[in-house]
Regions:
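Solvent-exposed, well-ordered loop and adjacent helix/strand elements within mature globular domains
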Residues: 5, 10-126
Length: 126
């Protein structure tokens, strides 16, 4: 499809608008520690048990509550793109504090300290 002579705003919207089963979000990292979770840092909101030796091996996502209202619910399988090394298949097993909007968190090992990505595409595949 060629979009010649279209307004720049239309082309930008066409290229970046999410489909019905996807959303564009901001993504950050979190660790399985009480400071970043609740007191039971080895269980997610869905009661999935986290391996304390290697929490990042599960590929677990936490989603903001507004995304849950859009169908990104606990137990969903999603594809992440536009997040560099975090791209791929992830499992929604946790939810974020209600103060966050349009945001996801990747559960990672404590060796990975920082990470933030903008315009990340989250696409529901199940």
């Amino acid at each position: 499809m060629i979009l010649l002579r279209q307004p720049k705003q239309y082309i930008q919207t066409f290229l970046t608008s999410p489909s019905d089963n996807s959303q564009i979000v901001t993504a950050t990292l979190y660790h399985a520690v009480p400071e970043q979770t609740n007191n039971d840092n080895l269980h997610t909101a869905s009661m999935f048990e986290i391996n304390p030796e290697c929490p990042g091996s599960h590929r677990i996502l936490a989603v903001s509550r507004d995304l849950e209202e859009l169908g990104f619910t606990l137990g969903s399988v999603v594809r992440i793109s536009q997040a560099c090394e975090m791209n791929g298949i992830w499992y929604i097993e946790d939810r974020m504090n209600k103060r966050w909007k349009n945001k996801i968190d990747f559960l990672v090992n404590d060796k990975i300290k920082y990470g933030k990505w903008y315009n990340v595409k989250i696409e529901k595949i199940n």
